[in-house]
Amino acid sequence: MARYTQRPENALKRANEFIEVGKPLRALDTLQEVFRNKRWNYAYSETVIEPLMFKYLYLCVELKKSHIAKEGLFQYRNMFQLVNVNSLENVIRGYLKMAEEHTEAAQAQSSAAVAVLELDDLDNIATPESILMSAVCGEDAQDRSDRTILLPWVKFLWESYCQCLELLRVNTHCEALYHDIARMAFQFCLKYNRKSEFRRLCDKLRKHLEDICKSSNQTTGVSINKVETQQLCLDTRLYLLDSAIQMELWQEAYKAIEDIHGLMALSKKTPVPKTMANYYQKLAMVFSKAGNQLFHAAALLKLFQLTRELKKNLTKDDLQRMAAHVLLATLSIPLPSAHPEFDRFIEADKSPLEKAQKLAVLLGLPQPPTRVSLIREVVRLNVPQLVSEDFRNLYNWLEVDFNPLNLCKRIQSIVDIIETGPTETNLLSPYIQSLKDVTIMRLIRQISQVYESIEFKRLLELATFCNIFELEKLLVESVRHNDMQIRIDHQKNSIYFGTDLTESQREYRPDGPALQSMPSEQIRSQLVNMSTVLTRAVSIVYPNRERDQRAKLRTQMVHHYHEIKDREHQRILQRQKIIEDRKEYIEKQNNAREEEEARRQEEESRKAKLAEQKRLELEQEERERKRHQNEIQAIKEKSLKEKVQQISQTAHGKKMLSKLDEEGIKKLDAEQIAKRESEELQREAKELQSKLKSQEKKIDYYERAKRLEEIPLFEKYLAEKQVKDKEFWEATEKTRIENAIAERKDAVSQQERLKRMYPDRDEFLEALKKERASLYVEKLKKFEIALEAERKKRLADRVIRRREERRQAFLREKEEERLRKEEEIRLAQAAEERAAAEARRLEREAEDEKRRAQYEKQRAKEEEAERKIKEDRDRLAREVAVERERSDKERDTWRPRGGDRPSAASAGGGGGAGEWRRAAAPIGDRNERAGDRIERGGERMERGGDRMERGGDRMERGGERTEHRDRERRDNEGADSSWRVRREPDSQRGAGVKDASGSAAPPSRDDKWRRGGDRDRDRDRDFRNDGPRRDRDDRDDRDRGGFRRNDGPRRNDDAAPRETGGNWRDAPRQSDRDNRRPAGDRRDREVRGGDLRGPESRAPKEGGPSGGTGTAASGGGNWRTAPGPRDEPAPKRDQPQDKENKAVDDGEWTSVKRR
């Protein structure tokens, strides 16, 4: 079964329809099915799939389904990464743009929500709720709003960036897009201050870079050996470094510096000077934030060298500013410890020397820098000459001049110059504190060379930068690092320098300006100084000794050379030949090795290609197998999903599905789900019914109780309301009366005031009437004329309208009368049809009842007949057993007298022979016939089933044939006095009553098996008496040929003639053949097949149960050929459709009359 899938165009239309009706989830599922279907993956171009992909990503953004968007993006990448990279780039950029727009909208919404909250109440800005919230969670309203509104979209945008980076990390065609998205992710972290996400992003990019460096053999993989890839990675790491510095994540910045240095070392091309300058600048900033002044100054020095050498348009001011920066950073380096090896005894992961070596590698230095080496390099580069006079003096005061009494005052002036500089461009202010510390250390060292002891007060006067506590701390640090011998006497508030002359654990190397050595150092180096002085004295006393020794040594060397020069020359020539031979041998070995290596590589390449081809074939087979399995599983899941979706549209279906989890639903099939749905529906119906009953009872009780309680309250309320209404009416009436009186008084006063104007009014009216009397009369005539014309017109219109109304009313009455008569006729016809249908129904019911009664009666007779047959069979078996025992006894008695039989025969003549033959024959014949009867009884039982089958058809026509059969039976009884038609009581049949002739009375119809037995026994006796006549056919006419010679009932047969027809004459004539059923009709064969069988079909087989040569129809009393009414099988119960068919058939088949 093929899986039904929609085409991409239809899926897009379907999704738009779902979106219009407010079902985005259904729309997303529709589009997702397209991307999951592998049939459409490569069958359509990007012009068809790209709009669908944009709609898919739009729905993912709207619903915040980042994992579903990831799945679709991966599918789209696999489809178009080698076909159309621009389409993939447009889709990814559009996806990220939508995510950014939604995030910005959420940020604006969050800010607007906070603004609304802040402007809600200007009089009460700090509400109790806001105070409690800030005290509990430590967040303001903006933070809470961002967490609720903004944070979900920020998380979605972050996941989108991560998915796109993972999608494009190994695709060389989308390498530029990958680095653009990385920069967008850095901007995201800066904009929303996501430090933890920034760290994860750095780790992710570093992991991607490691993967690229490890494997670069893929077809679409990114190769780190490409110059473009190296430059893109370097630019991205520089951007990462800038972002880390802005976010003050110095650890990530240091890791980024390591990555940048690794990329620059990996690149075969020298980085551009701009990149290197940016690198040294950022590195100096990181070292400054880390507090490593030594490497900070080294980085600035490298930057200064690079800028000075490569920047051609560098101005003097810029050079002076950079030189001052470098000089001040170098001078601010703390004085080094005299024993750095002390750190070796501290347990740490890495020793300081290893760390320093690693940092020196980042700067491109062969060994870690020191303060002395940096100052020496600064002097070599002539940096002190490039700076201003003040900073040049600073260098001289700290590194050249020895003036401890004025050192701090001089440095303070430089500090004041730095502090008073512009704040925006002042890059030297971070070095002030370090410069002060270096100045204090210089002061202490210079003081120790001048003074043996000094008071704290005096030393504080000289060290104007610090207080007593800071000074004491610096002194302790100097002793800790074993730089100086210092002892502090707090009792005297004094400081002692170099008091222990026996202690000097290091060689004194003056760093900076020095006046003299310390006493302990002088004692430690006394022997060395003595040796130097003595050597100098010997050289003065014996000035030519050394020259003579050198001349003698030279002569010996020349003599030795002349002795070995030839031998050495030959050795050198031989060595040269050996070297040439060795080179040739090595070259041959290399060529052979290269050829072998080439052959080996070619063989490995061939094997690899074969293995790869085999692997691809296996993968293709595996993909096909999985695809087939997935399609089958998808079909099952789709059918199940459709069933679940169909069920979920109903309330009970949703309730039933809510009880099942995903695993439970997958284990069920559609039938089980439908079954559970029906069960759930029934259960809900029962629950609803019970709830309604309980609710009905509860509401009934509640309403009755409520109304009983309401009655006194209503009475009280009505009484109070009547009182209040009465009071209100009285007050209102009183107010109304007062207002009416006041109005009356006001009107009367007004009337009295206006009475004096009546004469003036009358005069004015009279004058006006006189002026306009003629005009009034003229207009009055025109009005009367127009009025008369309008009256006539309206009267004429009314006459016409009334005439038309009467005509329409007459037509309506006629139409209503016609419709009424038609309705009466239709109702009368419908009533007649209903009455006729009811009469037919009653008639059919009566006929069915009649047939049912006949069928029950016939069935009872059949059961009675079967019971009697069974009893006769049992009795016959017992009689046969008794006869066999008696025959055995008689055989034992007459066999010894075998000679008497002939004499008896001769004495008796023929009659005697006949007597003994007739007396002996029935014994064997009786046994034989008994067996035949038993066998015939079995056949009767077998044929009983056929009669039962035909009984249904006979029963249908039994009602019409009953009277005819009874009439023929009465005629036969009156015409024939044969013993076959006489019925004796069962008692007489059982007692064996004899007739008037002295012979046993013949058996009744219920003993039909006896009639056939007697007839056969008589025929058997005749056969023995007259042997030659055994071949003659002495049967009467009705027994020969199997057909009756007459059309009447069989003589001596009390059974009614069979309506189904047993005579060939009963076949329908030519006129009746059209009414017959087809020959293949089973009912026709069953009804007509009883007597239409030929002699061959009715004749028994040889050795059959009859025991004679005659047919089964021989003898008119044979029960097989003349079954009575009680032998007919019981009719079948009619089905409703069969009754209708048979009702139609009755009119067709009952027209065939017996002739």
From Swiss-Prot:
Principal location: cytoplasm
InterPro entries, per database record: EIF3A (IPR027512), eIF3a_PCI_TPR-like (IPR054711), PCI_dom (IPR000717)
GO molecular function: mRNA binding; translation initiation factor activity
Pfam (any one): PCI
Record region (Disordered): 589-613, 836-1155
GO biological processes: formation of cytoplasmic translation initiation complex; regulation of translational initiation; translation reinitiation
Residues covered by the PCI domain: 319-502
GO cellular component, one term: eukaryotic 43S preinitiation complex
UniProt xrefs under SMART domains: PINT (SM00088)
Alphabetic keyword roster: Cytoplasm, Initiation factor, Protein biosynthesis, RNA-binding
Compartment(s) of residence: Cytoplasm
PROSITE patterns: PCI (PS50250)
Chain intervals with Basic and acidic residues compositional bias: 836-900, 925-987, 1004-1057, 1066-1101, 1125-1145
The UniProt record lists the keyword Protein biosynthesis: yes
Biased composition (Gly residues): 1104-1118
Biological role stated in the UniProt entry: RNA-binding component of the eukaryotic translation initiation factor 3 (eIF-3) complex, which is involved in protein synthesis of a specialized repertoire of mRNAs and, together with other initiation factors, stimulates binding of mRNA and methionyl-tRNAi to the 40S ribosome. The eIF-3 complex specifically targets and initiates translation of a subset of mRNAs involved in cell proliferation.
Quaternary structure and partners: Component of the eukaryotic translation initiation factor 3 (eIF-3) complex. The eIF-3 complex interacts with pix.
Classification via HAMAP family: eIF3a (MF_03000)
Full protein name: Eukaryotic translation initiation factor 3 subunit A
Naturally occurring in which organism (per UniProt): Drosophila pseudoobscura pseudoobscura
